[in-house]
């Protein structure tokens, strides 16, 4: 079986990064089992890869299911283990004290039993053996040289489901049907045959379920469980459409349109082989083709007769689970041999030789001519279930020490032919670890063999399927998205899921929450009217009590097939199909009561927290339950309602008459066979029971002359979620309050769209009406109808979506608008495109930006259908610059026959679907047809195939080139380059030959003198300097002039429009070294100094030294002299221009100062004179009184002696001039 490869392409925006160093964002990561290996664009691994399970120190039973790269710094991975077991606490007492506990818990004891392979032996639940094997989100941080270091893990815990006491009826404590009741009823309805969580598969003509032979002791247990819940016993249909897995093993003959099984109790009604034909021919054919029917001969687990046993199916089931087949498709080479070197206990003979010292195990495998037909006609049910993510204990194997068995897988076998075991089916080339042994080629073809322990214990013990709640938990951890520290985990597109997780990257664990209701949008008024009239969706005077009851349930379906989720900017975008469908009447009689009517809608009330399961079982819900005692619930998720004389008109009061199945003599009276289908994976059986019915997930029947076709359309639920709503969902999930136990957060910006399935998935419809709906056509010839589906759901009319990828659409910018967000989803027959408004966090209005919020392009695949199988999607890449989405598919994983039961000639190779933002192009055989009904485009680029080599991986390099990794007959890896020519990828032999020359490096080395992948660089002679008068140029001048640099070399491209440039490096003042940078197929330029993740590429590009440049430019001296003179002139001018005016001002100032001084002197003299007069007058005044007094004195006095004369006083000097 081919290794499962998952590819991630990361674009490099060179303008944002230094040319010398290429970021790790330009590498690819290939997933090989649990190992993530970073690849360069040259298909070369950077290192040995990261084994995420071992790095996180988890049990080897864990497998990697999804991962996301967060820039260059973080890696987020999702892992899960098939050893997980979940138990449901069924409260039987009225004691309310326990109702606050979670009804769901991990069952470590059952996990230990599963690990030991024992159902009854003791289990050690202490210490390391008490693991619950829950799913985890692993976070790794980046380390140098493209490596990753484990940082932490986040446990995905179970949702909180409030326990309810017995006697609370169908209504929970909040007045609504609770999830507790839903899960309780799921467990009751599940169970009785191995692989079958639903007893409805094993039934007898017209006999009630409780009397069907389930095996020793199981009948009474069944009755007891149902009686406790007050459920009535329901009759089975009138024909056997089921099988018991301990007899028929549910094989489908791939070149026929019905499965081959052994009918129960010799009943011969129903499609397929009866007991006589089975025993006489088909049984032997199945045993020879598919060993799991019952091994015969040496090493066999027992003949088919030993599988009859009782209901416990001890030895037969054990042998089925223990087989280890080697699958090789039919070959024209009769002498091709593959054999195992030594005998093994069961199945093909094998032994693993384990070298000493922990070296890798080597296994030789050969094949005999008698084994060439193995698995060429039949497919095993358990293997198909395992492929879609269902836990099948016997197929869950992992590597480890002291392995007791092997599982061998061919690289060119289809994935549907071998057990899809964790340690086997996804194994690729050995990496040196004990978990991935090396290969030893012993014949024309080599196979990959993985050593690993099979279950311990006695072969008489039974490995039963885990309960349905365990399966729901396991399959709900299938894909993840990372948004700014919040991680969203959801289910798959193959099994309906009930819940999802939103956890923070800093949490240690996070609980799940479940889907809230969404409003139904039926598309057209007519379609809505159909549903209202037939199902009682509208409450009016004509509605009867049954319809009112159905209305009360709200037609809600919280079970989804997750088509995909992705992150764009700071928003999460998701899309899913509701697990149900609407059937239409195919009658051409316009007077018939069922003409143009939608006759059934599956509410999947068993999963409906608002409706409840009991109402369906007791036939109180009208259409979706037992009808007139002739129809019974077939499985947990979906129902089939074949109708004859269905309720008509708007009264809805006619008697329901059901004929089941429609037989040849009843064709004229039957009006419809309505397909109500919850899981689309039914390609391995299309009549009666499918392989997925074994899990209770699906029911489907063939469109042939004995059954009128129906039309089934679905509701596509989609939305955009911001960070705030994600946070609310995460916080709400942790709540244990009663209100939050039944109603979870509803994302406000979600919507549903009624998405029809294109009619051309059934061939031979009349072409009149130009693609009119099939049910609206006249003259339909029922006998010529044939499934034309190209995917793995070949015999289902149900829709299916995969590969959702979101991105920024810059197209509105050209019209003056902001860019919006776009997401593309591939569905059967076309492309769905969703457009979101980033400003409002909502879908675009129909008038916004000239874009519709949702568009669907009906684009048939035509004869190129062999290139497209939606179930084999490997990767999707969106390139905003070109507006293209690239979907890569692995054709090697397709079944041997397609939906038309015609053998496909070439199954080895890859296909790429290109979806563009505008227009519709369908490229087929180099012919292009342009359609215009929707703004999404579909182009099948076929041709990536190999007739001799095994293709193991594809790396889309651009919209023009893809690199394909292949292994030849000697198991030597090589790379081929495919070129897109008019929509078809064709191998380019010359380029493929060129990329081989890598000399053990990361990239192909450059080869002097030849035109290889890097083209050829011819340097000019040094004389070019004189010829072009460059000797007067300096090195810096040349480096900064691309035109001059380009004249130094001549480039011969290896492919059209390949570009090259020279980069100059100054080595001295007169010498220059030039090196080329050359464009590779991915559109990026690489040079000698380029690195990826810090690792030099060492391409060995040539270089050339040119000498003789001028040390100084010729203009340096004149400029220097001129600049000096100029400076002097400037200084002189400045001096003169400033000094002269300053002198004049000085002179004027001096003259002004003189005048001022004169005036001051005059004023000073005047003031001095006045001051002198004042002093004189003051002296005279002082002497006057004393003289007057002396004159008045009459008495004579003695004569006075005259005084001596005094010296004269100096004159008073005027003030000195300042």
UniProtKB/Swiss-Prot annotation:
Residues 109-129, 213-245, 262-353, 411-440, 1192-1218 are annotated as: Disordered. It comes from the Bacteria. CDD domains: adhesin_P110-like. This is Mgp-operon protein 3. It is a single-pass membrane protein. Residues 116-129, 301-342, 1192-1204 have a biased composition (Low complexity). Residues 265-286 have a biased composition (Basic and acidic residues). Residues 1205-1218 have a biased composition (Pro residues). The keyword Cell membrane applies. One of its GO terms (cellular component) is plasma membrane. The chain crosses the membrane at residues 1121-1141.
